[in-house]
A protein has these predicted regions:
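Nucleotide-activated chemistry modules centered on ATP-dependent adenylation/adenylyltransferase
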Residues: 2-410
Length: 410
């Protein structure tokens, strides 16, 4: 047992059987050791919910659990993430202050799956690796409270008030391997880049720290032309001269690679976190950047004026709730239902060009679009323009009333 004297002052919760939301990273791996040593836990279950980990990361998680003498359980949640989460994100043009709410979604999916597993296994507590300074602790706890309200929630890093350096030192005491490379959180929808250097506002992330994105100076000198098809609001196909890719997940993987190569998808922003403090966040999301830009444009073509005016309000509420840990909140469900119901007419095919960070729309077609140039254009007869005269008089009546009241604008 590592010497922890003086490292905590609160009374730690005690439990017998605990399911750990486990990625194999520093925080959750350390929990596997701390639970039996300081929380009285007799049985620890390490549960990895895969929403985008590589084979190497999965093997690292498995080997660390084995090193700790803890059984490891793997849940594949990528299909659910695509079908139930990314689809709603596209319908809602997901954006919280410019961030496509990827980690916000995955944490809540992971929390639900781990909570359900804990109940199935007869656990009396759930453990997760959040710090006390971030957003994930709120997201995870919200979901734990909804799906396993009677189970204790253990958060060792927060309860011991660890600094990152203390965690590294303690991992060394426990002989747990630690990869000192740049931290990240990756799904197919977005990858966040975590590093202490991000707090340095003069620092530019090195090219080698990106998975998909290339800086414009490293991007190809020739553009890449693509055709992307949407059906009922979702991208179903992307084609180039060399490839033809179908299916939402495959389209996203393809656009992450090709979009990133062409310098699309870097997000370097200031984010207002759940506790009200600003943080600098760096993300790469090439597929999300391309698809959301085209989806918004297609909605402008296919939705009514009133839908276009109202839907962004619903989208903002949806993104806010998801970011703040409310994926399963009733109002989030209501917003998602509205957005989904609006998508039946959002159909079209786009020809686009990717070039050194730009997304250029070359052409669009839609069988359900509301653009009617034969009516709007002055080059065609359309309707008798004289019919608009009486309509303008009716439309202006309120302004005549305002003038009589002496409320003219100065």
């Amino acid at each position: 047992m590592a010497d922890m004297s003086g490292r905590y002052v609160i009374e730690l919760p005690q439990a017998k059987k605990v399911a750990v939301a486990y990625s194999g990273g520093l925080d959750s791996a350390l929990a596997l050791k701390l639970l039996p040593d300081y929380y009285g836990v007799e049985e620890v279950l390490a549960v990895t919910c895969n929403v985008g980990l590589t084979e190497a990361e999965l093997e690292e998680a498995r080997s660390k659990a084995e090193l700790c003498g803890v059984p490891w359980f793997l849940m594949d949640a990528e299909q659910e993430f695509v079908e139930d989460f990314i689809t709603r994100a596209i319908y809602a043009n997901s954006s919280y202050e410019g961030y496509p709410v990827a980690t916000s979604m995955t944490r809540q999916l992971i929390a639900r799956r781990v909570a359900e597993f804990a109940l199935e296994q007869g656990c009396d507590a759930i453990c997760e690796g959040s710090t006390g300074k971030g957003n994930d602790q709120y997201r995870m706890n919200n979901v734990f409270s909804m799906f396993a309200p009677d189970l204790k929630v253990i958060v060792p890093v927060r309860e011991f008030n660890f600094t990152r350096q203390q965690e590294k030192e303690l991992s060394a005491e426990y002989n747990l391997p630690y990869n000192p490379g740049i931290g990240d959180d990756r799904t197919m929808w977005c990858r966040s880049i975590g590093s202490g250097e991000v707090d340095n506002l003069q620092m530019r992330i090195a090219q080698e720290d990106y998975l998909w994105f290339r800086y414009p100076e490293n991007a190809p000198d020739q553009p890449t032309d693509l055709e992307i098809e949407f059906q009922a609001g979702l991208p179903v196909r992307v084609s180039s001269e060399a490839e033809d890719v179908c299916g939402l997940a495959q389209v996203i993987h393809y656009l992450n690679r090709v979009g990133g190569e062409n310098a699309l998808g870097k997000i370097d922003m200031f984010e207002d976190g759940m506790i009200g403090l600003k943080s600098r966040e760096v993300y790469e999301a090439p597929a999300a950047a391309i698809l959301l830009a085209l989806h918004r444009d297609l909605e402008q073509l296919c939705l009514t004026k009133e839908q276009i005016q109202f839907k962004p309000q619903v989208e903002r509420q949806w993104s806010y709730m998801v970011y703040h840990g409310g994926w399963y909140h009733p109002v989030t469900m209501d917003c998602a239902a509205f957005c989904a119901n609006s998508q039946w007419a959002v159909n079209g095919v786009y020809q686009v060009r990717l070039y050194k960070g730009t997304l250029d729309i070359l052409g669009r077609q839609s069988s359900t679009g509301l653009f009617a140039p034969e009516l709007r254009s002055l080059a065609t007869a359309g309707w008798d323009q004289r019919e608009s005269g009486p309509a303008t008089k009716i439309h202006a009546m309120q302004y005549k009333i305002l003038a009589k009241r002496g409320l003219k604008a100065e």
